[in-house]
Amino acid sequence: MMCSGYYNYDTPYTPEFAGQQDFQGQVVHPQHWPEELDYQDKQVVVIGSGATAMTLVPSMAEKAGHVTMLQRSPTYVASRPDQDAVANTLRKFLPGSVAYAITRFKNTQMQKFLYGKMRAEPEKMKKVLVGMVRKALGPKYDVEKHFTPKYNPWDQRMCLIPNGDLFKSITAGDTTVVTDHIDHFTT
């Protein structure tokens, strides 16, 4: 087993950006989210495209005026249902612990299979993953720029989004993805 960590929960890494001291908006680190944060009808920028951003962006877009997800480079993103139909069916007929064990086995085997497939046939699986995003966002969306990484699937961690909510937020016009570097903050 190998485990690694790269941050301290109490003092998360927060990069500094030119112009940040003059920025008049509020800067929030999601690790220490203020409960009273009011972003209703505001223009929000989420910096990053990791797992936190992938769930934060569509959720915030429900209340914000608009949310922009700013990323330096794309991440592989796959949508999957937030409910497991097999697990839900098994729980109707089996004790919870048995249903859990079967579901856990099914999910770990599926993950092993998909991981192996992506490592064995990276170009083919890259086309599948990018094709799913293209199908969700439509032919006019620049999937190459915003959702096609330069690396192979699982060279870096992939992000799963529940029920395609990020894609729905983008197609609804509530969210924009920008792939670029931050030069400086403006007021």
Predicted stretch roles:
Residues 119-120, 153-156:
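Short histidine/acidic/glycine/proline-rich micro-motifs that form metal-
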Residues 33-36, 146-151, 158, 175-187:
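A conserved short coil-to-beta-strand element within the FAD-binding core of flavoproteins
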Residues 130-133, 158-162:
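Long, low-complexity segments enriched in small/aliphatic residues
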Residues 1-2, 185:
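Generic low-polarity alpha-helical segments
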Residues 2, 6-142, 175:
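Rossmann-like dinucleotide-binding core of oxidoreductases
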